[in-house]
């Protein structure tokens, strides 16, 4: 059963009611949540802070590395192939416990794509993929801390460890 889905550019789907991502369904659900929490003397922000206190603070960030000029696409391709030929074993001191290579549809059950996902020993993830429209490689980080500052510091450690690879 599909519950919800969303994307980086703020498209949102909830349930089977709407078949294309838009802001209308997300706005409606936020209004319903706000009304509910107000009816019990709370607020969306207050409830969100309670969730953070219970589960920690997840952070999702993206870094982009540009590869301009005629040689940019070749550099990007070589970089992605290099990550496949000599797989990373750790990032910023965190062991990589699983690598999912989306160029292997037999592993994912999905169509082939030039995407690598690294699952770290602390539950964080790092996703590396070339942009489909620009001469860039994007790295997506999902980190967790007790608070936002911890999650941001963890993201920065991972980013610093990966910068030399993107040079």
Regions found by a protein language model. Give the residues of each.
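Phosphate-binding and adjacent anionic-ligand microenvironments
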Residues: 1-129, 136-138, 147-153, 159-167
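Active-site beta-strand/loop architecture of penicillin-binding DD-peptidases
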Residues: 142
